[in-house]
Amino acid sequence: MYKEASRVLKKGGLLMVGFMNPWIYMYDADIVWDKPDEELFLKFPLPFNSKELEEEGKITINPEYGYEFSHTLETQIRGQLKNGLAMIDFYESCDKRHRLSHYGSDYIATLCIKL
């Protein structure tokens, strides 16, 4: 993705990217969102792939939400840096509607400039 973005951007062009912080995917979403009294525990390895987990019978996907896939921070950030983009800003945000936000940020956004 970043190779193509870099290819079409002119020198000095900006690319803003937002993505989920990968650690969020390590927890069972049902416990995070619907069972606040249950203990949190690590359940899934990264990178997260809900389609594979469904095929293995480990989770059931609600068709209303679709499949989710995560990428490692290295894939996201290094992918930008190794494709002619320089990071000029970085932002994290929390979704206060669930308890994981007490431990870290849910969302990450980067702003890069084409070199």
What feature does the model see in each segment?
Residues 7-10, 71, 114:
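Basic side chains
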Residues 17-78:
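SAM-dependent methyltransferase
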Residues 1, 26-28, 99:
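Short glycine-/acidic-enriched loop or helix-start segments at secondary-structure transitions
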Residues 1-14:
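A short glycine-rich, Lys/Arg-flanked "PGG" loop and its adjoining helix->strand segment in the class I
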Residues 75-115:
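C-terminal lobe and adjacent flexible extensions of AdoMet/dcAdoMet transferase-like proteins
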Residues 15-16, 87:
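A short hydrophobic/small-residue beta-strand
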